Amino acid sequence: MAEASGELYFLSEIDPETQNFTKYVKIGIVKNDRSTESRIDEHQTGNPREIRDLKVILSPRVRKLERLLHGVFERQCVGGEWFEFGEETLTEAINFAIEQAAELCGLEEIVSEVENFAKTESTEEEVPSDENARDLARRFHFLHQNEKKLKAVIGDVNKKIADVEDDKIGKDLLSADERLTERKTIFPKPSFKKADFKSQELDLYLNFCEISTEVKQKTLSINKDIKNDAGESTSFFPEWNQEYDEISKLIVETSELIDSSSPEAVFENLMVNRCELTKFQSLYDFRKTNFEYRLKHACGLASGIKGVCTWKRSLIEKEVFDETKFKEEHPDKHAEYTKTGESYQRTFVGRGNRRPVIY
């Protein structure tokens, strides 16, 4: 399903005393069924400071653009969608948003065609490879692998920060209200275990099934030789060399901070590094998705590109189980196979300190 287009906005407030914009800026979106003006009206309700837009940018896949901006400027975040910007950084953020929106606009037709390809059974043929296809595949694989690495390091940082805060709270050096992290136990909602029901009572299960056909796509798979070519080297991508060097040093430094015997002393550095890691992870995720669309577009209706990648879409028969009807006719049996999954813990890190409220 196509991601919605819309407007990415930069909003700020007028200081009632100076009549100038404050340093706090909200970066958010409205999808194509709404307008920034209506969003401002909603924010204005009960707010004594006048809210105005600093910049509004039209963009396809606008949610993707918003996530990118929030990640890249994580260090300036003061809570939620609010950021503290000096004039220079604000200009940088707006110009960056305009550039990335242009990238998304340039891909709009490609994305639309790829979404149509995804609904169509692929042929048995493979497209002949060329240097452009190999370059797309190398870049996609490089970004995909390093984005996963960044995400893993961020997870380790989150756990370490939470451990340090737990220790500080235990020593009365930090109150629970001041902590930036939150450990949550996630309790999955009860769900009907269709597979268990099918394996135990197949005949009854089939009474509530219909067979339908649909096109199912497999994950885009990169050829082993291309993976070996790309590896973790940026030799194919000189424009990313400096950035990749920064990331490599940042990961090494962050790992040393995590392993530090005095974690409290490096707490602030961990927070700073987390923001930098998040910036690069957001960039890599954004680029990876765009290169994936380009590579799939190069596949077209074929099942892949010879020696480069495969992207198969097959017409399959699918059992469609009518759970609603089954529950109505067999409520006790439905309850018997409705179970709650095992709970698990997740660590969340707040996005900056909350913006001061001025009345």
Segments predicted by a language model, with ranges:
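Non-catalytic accessory segments flanking enzymatic or RNA/DNA-binding domains
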Residues: 1-167, 174, 188-266, 279, ...
